[in-house]
């Protein structure tokens, strides 16, 4: 029981995304910002667009171009299965795809730098 609580406390809660996401080999993505976050920490993602108004096939295609090879659009279960197996079996390829995401998203902290810059211009 105590071990379960320790695991729970280390994975759940505010500011835990990087901790648990970094444990993954591949991310399954169906949301815009989460996809960019997981690719940004070097985890390649498989993108599965839904029927909702925001994460559509066209959005997923644009995001795939933005993030390069770090995210791969899967338009069917078969494609998803094929790409997932390939990523899991090919560590060198998986690591390279993850590196592309890190390069495309850049270092952490850009939002604060942008906000500080804007604030300085408004003074």
Task: Label each residue range with its predicted role.
Residues 1-4, 8-123:
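Nucleotide-activated sugar donor-binding and catalytic core shared by glycosyltransferases
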